[in-house]
Amino acid sequence: MARARLAGVRDWAASAKLASAGKPGQRVIDAEWVQLNLARVHAKAEFLKLLNWRVAAGGSVGPADASVTKVFGTEFAVEAYRLLMEVLGAGAVVRSGSAGEVLAGRIERAHRAALILTFGGGTNEVQRDIIAAAALGLSIRRR
């Protein structure tokens, strides 16, 4: 996940004010749920970075580790962009260049692109079968 996108949402939330929900005039970033969404995205992004470094470094990596990284990473990307879009509100889905758009629609475009990652490079269902067989010693389901 691009750190710039998380930083962009954080910066937007630090400068944007709530209009009606919560406390009108309060900065968006001061809402507890916004802080939780941003913290979740940051923490999982850091975990994914460590997971990728572990797989890239080799060493004691098992045969299912690349599959684990792929499944976690792609599903996290979808979740992360959904959480960031919640922070941005309705403006997150407004077309770039239109009145009311937020951050030029980049987060919504990234969310749509992240959905493709769940089947590009091997569907997550197939990756789970690899994890089941290689990491857990389970039999692979016939499809």
Please report, for each region that a protein language model flagged, where it lies by residue:
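Alpha-helical interface subdomain recognition
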Residues: 1-143
